[in-house]
A protein has these predicted regions:
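Glycine-rich adenosine-cofactor-binding loop
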Residues: 22-62, 162-169
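Glycine-rich phosphate/adenylate-binding loop
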Residues: 1-20, 25, 73-78, 82-221
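A generic structural motif
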Residues: 57-67, 102-109
């Protein structure tokens, strides 16, 4: 199976890029191997939940290096957990390797799941940073101070966020397994925020940023 029909939906909704500047590596057949990258309770809960559901789960937390590059990770999906901001070298490595990835974190007690990135086909984490910098010129400075800093939330909220992330991994797995029947995974170009007091869910849409390197060469400049 492939993601052709899923990508057609993405193009129709404007969440995908026409053409590629970085290579997307298709997930063949089914989503099986997942790497949970990050240190903290959120990653722990999610890794346990995914393993119990039958996925082959690998844990990691270190920075990539020349000896251990991201391109060497044998995985179908990387879930970036816990850290408010992940290492720029890691993000660049995932994009260059064409590895699908999902960000999951706690921020000031709020659980945030997404976006789900298909490199070169959907908006990416750098797109979000560029959008935030457009609104707040100080964001690049703030972001640099948050690299590998774990967010925190109440234990129940953390478990609920892990469960929500697992649900969206299942959505992707179903879209790959049965593209004719499954709906479009909700987190392509979107984040879902789980708030409490009062309990509510907020969805935000992130379009591809015109200055991001993930855009096709023809669309830049």
């Amino acid at each position: 199976a492939d993601l052709i029909r899923v990508l057609e939906h993405l193009l129709a909704t404007g969440l995908a890029l026409r053409g590629r500047r970085v290579p997307f590596r298709p997930i063949e057949g089914r989503l099986r191997r997942i790497r949970v990258h990050g240190t903290g309770p959120l990653g722990g809960h999610l890794a346990t939940s995914l393993a119990d559901a039958g996925f082959s789960v690998t844990r990691s937390s270190g920075r990539p290096s020349l000896d251990h590059p991201v391109s060497g990770w044998a995985t179908d999906l990387v879930v970036l957990t816990d850290y408010l901001v992940h290492d720029t070298m890691l993000i660049a490595g995932l994009m260059d390797a064409g590895t699908p990835h999902l960000q999951v974190r706690m921020r000031d007690g709020v659980g945030i799941v997404g976006p789900l990135v298909l490199p070169g086909l959907t908006s990416c984490l750098i797109c979000i940073d560029l959008h935030r910098a457009d609104r707040d010129p100080e964001w690049p400075i703030v972001s640099a101070q948050l690299v590998r800093v774990a967010g925190h939330g109440r234990p129940a909220a953390t478990r609920a966020t892990a469960a929500l992330a697992h649900e969206h991994v299942d959505q992707l797995a179903e879209a790959i397994r049965s593209p004719d029947r499954a709906g479009l995974p909700e987190l392509f170009g979107r984040t879902v925020e789980l708030h409490s007091e009062p309990t509510r869910i907020v969805t935000k849409t992130w379009a591809p940023h015109p200055l991001c390197r993930c855009r096709p060469a023809a669309a830049v400049g």
